[in-house]
Amino acid sequence: AKQIANEKDLNTQIRKYLELVEKVQELYTLQSDLEWLNVEAVKLAFADMKKQKGYDAAKYEPMLNELVRLEKKGFKGIYNGDEQAIADAKKALECKRAILLANPLLDADKIVAARFKVGSKAHQIMTPSLGTQANNWSNQESAGREGFDAEIVELSNLRGDIQMRQVYKPKNGSSIADLKLHWDGDRVMFTQTQDDKRWNIYEVNLDGTGFKPLVENDEPDLEFYDGTYLPDGRVIAISNIGYQGVPCVNGSDAVGNMVLYDPKDKSMRRLTFDQDANWNPVIMNNGRVMYTRWEYTDLTHYYSRIVMHMNPDGTENKALYGSGAMFPNSTFDVQPLPGHGSAFVGIISGHHGVARSGRMIIFDPTKGRKSTAGMVQEIPHRNRPIKEEIKDQLVNGVWPQFIKPTPLNDKYFLVAA
């Protein structure tokens, strides 16, 4: 930097400062990536994937050996501008990426996702900038309704230079929330605003055709969001159908309860009659519906978002996880694990503080149904005990933070972090 400051030509000085900034940014990114290199975890993943049909262990074992060698050699030289150390660090990260992305579970080589263009704010924003509500006690109605640059995309060539194809983009600046792939894998359900800025459930084919609302309703003040497909063609969605609001904010945040809707005959029936919010209905492997419900009255409501399950018609509604406990405060984005009758993954978060993102936990209610008793594993912290922590802002200062996990099986997940 001192040498640059002594440059007499201003244009040369500016160019060299820009080059220095790029170099510092490269080293910062390398340092951040190396913190999560975790060679021991890569070894365990390799040993597990070797057992899967289709994994080319002979191809990737030399990469694993090279990764081990490079880690043993060390990367401290990157801070002195040692070009060999920088090259070694990049090589180690490339080996890790290749080994893990060779997982046969990714052989389909396509992912459908929501993409948000956020420019230079990408390293600073949290989930409200990605279309979620700005707190942990409200539904989608409290989320931003315009000013987004969002689209549904299909990602492919996952193991190489990733390709991206636009499936759909709103024309009104709406966010895109609550993506649910149809059972047939040819179309996707999602939430966006209508022209009058009310939320509704929509569907589009993955080839970009067939865009349409899934819920058609003439009521001028009803909204629908956070939907899920039922196997029989009907859908469950969250709606402001109860016309009530959250008490502690004087009703300013609308409460959403679940409705059952049939697109064929446009019939609708309310399923839940809760004082406060429901979130994230999803079909379990046994055909029941799992969701999160916020209990409020006569208890410490900072700590009472409970995972529930019910039949698709709303009967036999029961607590599944968290009733009677103060940890965790919230469990969002629950998804059943493939091949399991009881286990699921979810994101635990707080009440105030960081909204909707948090720690990623695998639960199994057959092992316990409250607090840490049924928490099988926190990802990515292998061998770290999960400790009960009764705290309002539960995940403030926690890193990494996750949202929207999608299990590929009971060991591997796609998740936004």
Where are these regions (language model features)?
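Short, conserved, GDST-rich strand-edge loop motifs in beta-rich repeat architectures
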Residues: 116-147, 193-194, 198, 237-254, ...
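Multi-bladed beta-propeller domains
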Residues: 160-174, 205-223, 261-276, 311-330, ...
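Long amphipathic alpha-helical scaffold segments
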Residues: 5-33, 47-166
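Hydrophobic beta-strand positions that form the internal "hydrophobic ladder"
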Residues: 111, 188, 235-236, 289, ...
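Asp-box/WD-like beta-propeller blade repeats and closely related beta-sheet repeat scaffolds
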Residues: 197-279
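Signature of short aromatic-glycine-proline-rich micro-motifs recurring in repeat-based ectodomains
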Residues: 176-180, 224-227, 325, 330-351, ...
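Residue-level detector of Asp-centered blade-edge/turn motifs that repeat once per structural unit
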Residues: 106-107, 183-184, 230-232, 284-286, ...
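Beta-propeller blade signature
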Residues: 150-156, 202-207, 252-265, 304-315, ...
